[in-house]
Every structure is written in C-alpha cells, then in structure tokens.
Amino acid sequence: GQPIVVGEGSNVQDGVVLHALETLSEGEPVAKNLVTVGGKKYAVYIGKEVSLAHQSQVHGPAAVGDHTFVGMQALVFKATIGKNVVIEPGAKVIGVNVPEKRYIPAGSVITTQAQADALPEITDSYPFATLNEGVLHVNEAFADAYLHLEEGGESTGGAEKPAAGH
C-alpha cells in the first residue's frame, strides 16, 4: 500500500519494517486501509522527529505522531499514535488511537480503546520522558561523523577530539 511517508528529522534504524495493506483496488482507494493526517490519506504516516528503533514495525493503516519513540521490536498495526508518545520495547499497539503524551510499557499488548485511553501520561518523573530527543541527537551526530569521514576527515566517534595534552 502507498503512500508511506516518513517526516523530516525522523530516525529509521536497522531492521525497521514499514508496510501497508492494499490501498487501491481496481483504481479506487480502499478507505479502510488508509489513515487521514492533515486532510491527506496515507497507508503509513510517520511524523516529524520520530524514532523508529531497531526491528520495530509499523504496519498500515497507521499513523505515528511527531516526536514519538517506537521502541525496539515494538509493533504498531492499524493504529494511530499521538504526538510525544513513547512505545517501550516489545509493546504491541493494535487497532486503537493512543492519545498524546502517553507511554506504553515494555511488552504491553494494547488492543482495546479502553486500554489505550487508560495508558499513563508522560510526566517529568517518567524515566524515558526525553528518550526520543536523545536518540535523535546521537544519531544526528553519527550521521555528521559519517559525512565527515566520507569527506576525507578522521573519525572522532561522534565526539569532539580532546585538546592536545589531555
């Protein structure tokens, strides 16, 4: 299915699967296999500055809101995820709408809207409240380091070189 869109500044790590069901049949849209974001229809929509961690899967129809972290081996299927959400590793979110600023604990299976509505809110005390920002930052540093190497520079491992004598 198409279109599949990944927003600006998003991070798609190794082993991620983005897939969708058929979105056209005999030249006509298959509405049940599309999500609407901003008035446009998508098979899979990944917002801006989203992290899709190793081996996570987003299977359409699905939408993942801006600034969201989808953890390692997590699954989003036929679901809409709000902005600023953390889906911890191994969680499965199927057929629901997750409100903004919530987290899904590791290994959870969320298959009813009542479960989705009852998800805990992200607060300052939540240990992964800023996880997505950190993941985006470190991966941006990796990308910059790779570009520097490609241009003939020396690797700094993504970190600044220490001053001489230190």
Q: Which residue stretches match the model-derived regions?
A:
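Glycine-rich hexapeptide-repeat left-handed beta-helix
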Residues: 2-3, 8, 13-48, 54-56, ...
